[in-house]
Amino acid sequence: MISLPSGTRIWLVAGVTDMRKSFNGLGEQVQHVLNDNPFSGHLFIFRGRRGDTVKILWADADGLCLFTKRLEEGQFIWPAVRDGKVSITRSQLAMLLDKLDWRQPKTSRLNVLTML
């Protein structure tokens, strides 16, 4: 996983994104659709129409970075909102990339120990 500075926000870009877009196209979408700055250091996560691919755009001290993950089967869990952006935590990002439902994580039930 990438080490992110404190204060870095992680944004899911709602809706469907054309996965043919790269640095310029995704950066333009961040600027004009989300009214945000792609060089802010925040992560912007886009999902394609089929739901099996996400792209993460972020800027570090040296320039723009683009990470792509495509699932061999299944889809990434995505918010139901159609436009705008949704903020998630680092833990939710890890769950998203592991194809887990990050929206309502469930804890495993702890075994109750009894003293005899």
Predicted regions and their residues:
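Polybasic/polar functional segments that serve as interface/processing modules
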Residues: 1-116
